[in-house]
Amino acid sequence: MIRKIKPQIRVIGFDDGTFSFKSKIKRDKTILVGVVMKGSQDVVGVVTRWIEVDGRDATEKMIEAIHNSRFKDLRIIMLKGITYAGFNVVDVEELSRETRMPVIIVIRKKPDLQAMEKALKKHFSDAEEKISLLHKAGKIKELIPGKLYYQAIGVSYDQAEEIIRLTQKSSLIPEPLRLAHMIASAVMSGESKKE
C-alpha cells in the first residue's frame, strides 16, 4: 500500500510490440518495453525484454526487467492490459508479490471476457490456466465512462485513480504506457503506431 502519492512518483509502464499472424504460428517473439517515468513529465529510462507470442513468459520477463534494472526507486507498475504478445497473460498477483509493488492495469476498451475465454478454449491447451489469470486480475472499474477502465492490485481504487490521473499528459492513456507503446511498435515495425 502506498502511504502518500507524490506528483513525481516513479512508475514503470509496460507494453508490447506488434507481431504478425505468421509469428503466432512460428511462436516467434516480440519486444516488451518498460518506460520508467517520474509522474507524467520526466522519462528516467527504458528497459526491454523479448517475450514469446502466445507464450507464458510475460510475467517472468517483467519481474526480471525490474529486478535487473538500475531503477530501485520504482513505486508502481502499470500495464496496458494483461495480455501481451497475443495471449501471453500476465499473472498480476505474482508480478505484484515478486516486485513488492502495486500493479495498475489500464484498458481503453472494456474486455469481453466471455469472448476471450472462448478463444482461449478453442486455441490453447493451457486455456484454463490463462483464463484463471484473467480472473485473478481483479474487478474491472470504469474511470472515464466508455473510454477508460482499470484494475488494481495492491493499491486502493482511489489511489489507483489518482495515480492514473497523475501520469496522464496528452492522452487518456498514462504517459509511461503511451511511450512504451510507441517505442515497442517502432522497434517491431520501423515506425511508432497510434495508441
UniProtKB/Swiss-Prot annotation:
Top-level division of the source organism's lineage: Archaea
Gene3D superfamilies, sorted: archaeoglobus fulgidus dsm 4304 superfamily (3.30.2170.10)
InterPro entries reported for this sequence: Endo_dU
NCBIfam families hit by this protein: PRK00766.1
Similarity comment: family membership: Belongs to the UPF0215 family.
UniProt name for this protein: UPF0215 protein TSIB_1161
Organism of derivation: Thermococcus sibiricus (strain DSM 12597 / MM 739)
